[in-house]
Amino acid sequence: MILADGFSSGKSDPDALWNGLENGEYPFISKLREAGFDLVLLGFEERSASIIDNADVAIECIEKVIADREGSAKLTVGGFSMGGLVTRYALAKMHHDGGDHQTATFLSYDTPHSGAWLPISVQAFAHFVKDNWGTLPGFGELLSSFSRMINSAAAKQLLRWHIESVSAQAQQHRARTDFLKELKRVGSWPPGVRRLGVANGTGTGAGNNIPARVTAMRTTGTELTGTRLDTQDTGEQIVAILKKTGSPEIPITTNGLPDIDGAPGGLFPEAPNLPGRPANFGTAAMLAGLLEGEPAELTYNATTFVPSVSAVAAAEVDDRDALYSKIDPADSELDHFMCASENQGHTVMTEELGRWIVDKLQTP
């Protein structure tokens, strides 16, 4: 069994990946071993690199596992978050190009098959901070890091709505549409392979109770006086006011997006090694606190990152009705899927989802 790491910046940390799978709520790796599976964890030199580039690494891994295995057992191949898209594309490309991936089952864990979400207000604030303080001695690198992650090759391919700069309009990036065309060119899915998937969000239509059009983060100091970031709503909306003291305020406007922050889905992952474990709005608050020397007002740390309909490939995330409806198995492009009983952190290994995977892998 091969499972690929997901999106982040920098090199994969195999110890952290292992720890999250084995030493949390459910000892997933031990349970796989008890069921007779060998597990290969696939990492990447740069997790924010292009999905297509990292798929080349996945293909090398699949070929090596086939060459090194004992016997002729078929493989299970998949991944967490972006890792599911990397391996999905890798398997489809291998088949399209005449290769033999010898894979019986594909598995994705909270993978954004239909796209991921990062609030436009948060994206704009990250770019605003980089533009104004990115060269600050001692802090510029840290203050610019969130913006650089948002503008990485993988983020442009994953996010359903993306902005490259404060002044840009929210839309699918060209890198995403190009990737989707390439995925379609190689067949979209590997034929003849059973598709399994799990979502860290609910499948009942029950959201996370985060309301639309409310302020999630507000600054309290003197450097960013008047800056606020709001949750997303439908229709035309000012989702953020960005203000550097002494300069004109910059309103950030969106139009035609769904109220997606509160939708059923896996929540934006928290950073466990940073104070307060910041997530999406939480990271914006952390950056504001660094600039102002006092904490920002944070109402919501994490909102939806991978909607459930995306994780189980059941609908597009710009379909507001689908976002908040019970998921019909007939709508999914997966053969079998499991949604969490409550909305939880993106790619968190739970007993509910882990046990379902282990059971399904033992069922033809």
For the regions a protein language model found, what residue spans apply to each?
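Loop/turn elements at helix/coil->beta-strand transitions in domains of secreted/extracellular proteins
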Residues: 1, 7, 34-40, 70-75, ...
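Short, surface-exposed "cap/lid" segments of acyl-processing enzymes
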Residues: 1-41
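Extracellular, luminal, or virion-exposed ectodomains of exported proteins
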Residues: 13, 19-21, 30-35, 56, ...
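Active-site loop/turn elements of alpha/beta-hydrolase fold enzymes
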Residues: 37, 42-46, 111
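Catalytic nucleophile-loop/oxyanion-hole region of alpha/beta-hydrolase
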Residues: 44-59
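Serine-dependent carboxylesterase/thioesterase catalytic core
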Residues: 55-183, 203-247
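Extended ligand-binding clefts on enzyme/binding-domain cores
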Residues: 90, 189-198, 203-205
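Terminal low-complexity/disordered tails
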Residues: 215-364
